Amino acid sequence: MLLTSSSPCESALATRYFRLDACLSSRYEVLDGRFTGEPVLPLCYGAGKVEHAESWAFREGIDLSRSYFYTDSNTDLPMLLRVGRPRVVNPDLRLRWEARRRGWTVLDWSRPDGALGLDDDASPQD
């Protein structure tokens, strides 16, 4: 499942490309077949991302406390706090600090050999 602040146009392409089961994204008003640019609230961003995820999880019978969430941005901190298995990938400095403080798994997917690496100071929580 893709949970993104991107528009439905962009996120639908990624959802199909990666063969994901579902996608939740920010939505924008359409009037007479054209985008007005006005967002439909809540945006799928920050705390709004949690609202979208909770509604979807309730409808689908998904337990977020047993779910994973992967991100590189500190703007996703509310969602990381909501799931049971937060994963931080190539984080910005603020998120790296927060992940270390909370003992979250930090993944390095930027290695040239394509290997996955774990941050030395973080350990898996499963």
Positions of PLM-derived features:
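C-terminal cap/substrate-recognition subdomain and adjoining C-terminal extension
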Residues: 1-126
